[in-house]
């Protein structure tokens, strides 16, 4: 079974080797047919502390690393500075 992969934006990097990633999803309400946006935060392992808030990253499922971390950052794109 393949591992799940999600795409999101880093919202926090305050803990060592960990980033908090916000993943947005969209779906249509089954009765009202309105498009609804929902988001969820995931704690992901960032071994080299290379990602900062605003960076786009892809995270992948892994075995539990700590109490909250079950995802690992596999790749990312750094936010372009102005």
Swiss-Prot record:
Transmembrane segments: none annotated. Pfam families: Ribosomal_S17 (PF00366). GO terms for molecular function: rRNA binding; structural constituent of ribosome. Keywords: Ribonucleoprotein, Ribosomal protein, RNA-binding, rRNA-binding. GO terms for cellular component: cytosolic small ribosomal subunit. InterPro entries: NA-bd_OB-fold, Ribosomal_uS17, Ribosomal_uS17_bact/chlr, Ribosomal_uS17_CS. It comes from the Bacteria. One of its GO terms (biological process) is translation. HAMAP family: Ribosomal_uS17_B (MF_01345_B). One of the primary rRNA binding proteins, it binds specifically to the 5'-end of 16S ribosomal RNA. Belongs to the universal ribosomal protein uS17 family. Part of the 30S ribosomal subunit. This is Small ribosomal subunit protein uS17. It comes from Bradyrhizobium diazoefficiens (strain JCM 10833 / BCRC 13528 / IAM 13628 / NBRC 14792 / USDA 110).
């Amino acid at each position: 079974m393949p591992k799940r992969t999600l795409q999101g934006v880093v919202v926090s990097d305050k803990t060592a080797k960990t980033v908090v990633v916000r993943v947005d999803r969209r779906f249509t309400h089954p009765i009202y047919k309105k498009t609804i946006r929902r988001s969820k935060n995931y704690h992901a392992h960032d071994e080299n502390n290379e990602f900062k808030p605003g960076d786009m990253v892809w995270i992948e499922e892994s075995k539990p690393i700590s109490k909250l971390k079950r995802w690992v950052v596999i790749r990312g794109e750094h936010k372009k500075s102005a």
